[in-house]
Curated annotation (Swiss-Prot):
<keyword id="KW-0548">Nucleotidyltransferase</keyword>
<comment type="subunit">
    <text>The RNAP catalytic core consists of 2 alpha, 1 beta, 1 beta' and 1 omega subunit. When a sigma factor is associated with the core the holoenzyme is formed, which can initiate transcription.</text>
</comment>
<protein>
    <recommendedName>
        <fullName>DNA-directed RNA polymerase subunit omega</fullName>
        <ecNumber>2.7.7.6</ecNumber>
    </recommendedName>
</protein>
<dbReference type="InterPro" id="IPR006110">
    <property type="entry name" value="Pol_omega/Rpo6/RPB6"/>
</dbReference>
<dbReference type="GO" id="GO:0006351">
    <property type="term" value="P:DNA-templated transcription"/>
</dbReference>
<comment type="similarity">
    <text>Belongs to the RNA polymerase subunit omega family.</text>
</comment>
<comment type="function">
    <text>Promotes RNA polymerase assembly. Latches the N- and C-terminal regions of the beta' subunit thereby facilitating its interaction with the beta and alpha subunits.</text>
</comment>
<dbReference type="InterPro" id="IPR003716">
    <property type="entry name" value="DNA-dir_RNA_pol_omega"/>
</dbReference>
<keyword id="KW-0804">Transcription</keyword>
<keyword id="KW-0240">DNA-directed RNA polymerase</keyword>
<dbReference type="GO" id="GO:0000428">
    <property type="term" value="C:DNA-directed RNA polymerase complex"/>
</dbReference>
<dbReference type="Pfam" id="PF01192">
    <property type="entry name" value="RNA_pol_Rpb6"/>
</dbReference>
<dbReference type="InterPro" id="IPR036161">
    <property type="entry name" value="RPB6/omega-like_sf"/>
</dbReference>
<keyword id="KW-0808">Transferase</keyword>
<dbReference type="GO" id="GO:0003677">
    <property type="term" value="F:DNA binding"/>
</dbReference>
<dbReference type="GO" id="GO:0003899">
    <property type="term" value="F:DNA-directed RNA polymerase activity"/>
</dbReference>
Length: 66
């Protein structure tokens, strides 16, 4: 079973496409040296850690105005 589950993540974000974009951006930030916002991540990979941050409400999603 995957952690965090897609069902949990979809409660935080209204679109799978937006979720992928946000996770990719946050994973890139982590790779570039940003501070991890979860204390003991389950995943050792940046994408997994980004997913855990979103599931734990550690990352605020902000809509850009067009």
């Amino acid at each position: 079973m995957l952690y965090p589950s897609i069902d949990l993540l979809m409660q935080k974000v209204d679109s799978k496409y937006k979720l992928v974009t946000v996770v990719a951006k946050r994973a890139r930030e982590l790779q570039d040296g940003a501070e991890l916002m979860v204390k003991k991540p389950v995943s050792k990979k940046f994408v997994g850690q980004a997913l855990e941050e979103i599931a734990g409400d550690k990352v605020e999603l902000v809509e850009e105005e067009k």
